[in-house]
Amino acid sequence: MVQLELKKDQIMKNKIIEALMYFQGDQGLSPEQVKEVFDLEKDQEGKKLLNDFMEFYNAREGGTKVFVFGEIYKIATIEPLKDYVSKLVSIVRYQKLSKAAIEVAGIVAYKQPITKSMINEIRGVASDQVVNTLLVKNLIEEVGISPTPGKPVLYGITNKFYDYFKIKSLQELPNLSEFDFVQSIDEEQEEEQSYEGFNLFSSQREN
């Protein structure tokens, strides 16, 4: 019975770490962050949980594995699949932006330099995939590293951002407070929503 309880406890910890790692995206997860989440006393305890999770996760025959970069643990695509990922990148580059991507682009424009966790906090939902899409389309870029714990990447907009949305300055964008940070709005609402005469959703260039 005790062994069963211990197994359930480890399974739950693995689930939590997987969720945290997914939320962090390419920023990864550090032993210090795990220590804080689980209310542990030492970073070494957080590192052990991460190593246990990595052993569990990498034992499966999946398309992703946990890799360690210094002290940061990340879930990433395995090497044999990189060509398929590259094909998807080329497809995404020529697709128009979703409402979620437009929202994130607006947040980066107004709050730059900004970390992914700050974007998540503003929107109230994880934005990792959206940020990756904007990076692929070269609308945002990495502009530095934050000195905060975990040293997350800072993002800012690129010159292509202005061309993509047909604007000359950020003053032409709607106020940040007027964005609706809910990803589940219907397509009809996306097309109808405009701000002070400027419709950010219809301002995209045909790419």
From Swiss-Prot:
The keyword Cytoplasm applies. GO terms for biological process: cell division; chromosome separation; DNA replication. It is found in: Cytoplasm. It holds the Pfam family SMC_ScpB. Keywords: Cell cycle, Cell division, Chromosome partition, Cytoplasm. One of its GO terms (cellular component) is cytoplasm. SUPFAM superfamilies: Winged helix' DNA-binding domain. Participates in chromosomal partition during cell division. May act via the formation of a condensin-like complex containing Smc and ScpA that pull DNA away from mid-cell into both cell halves. Homodimer. Homodimerization may be required to stabilize the binding of ScpA to the Smc head domains. Component of a cohesin-like complex composed of ScpA, ScpB and the Smc homodimer, in which ScpA and ScpB bind to the head domain of Smc. The presence of the three proteins is required for the association of the complex with DNA. Belongs to the ScpB family. This is Segregation and condensation protein B. It comes from Mycoplasmopsis pulmonis (strain UAB CTIP) (Mycoplasma pulmonis). The gene is scpB.
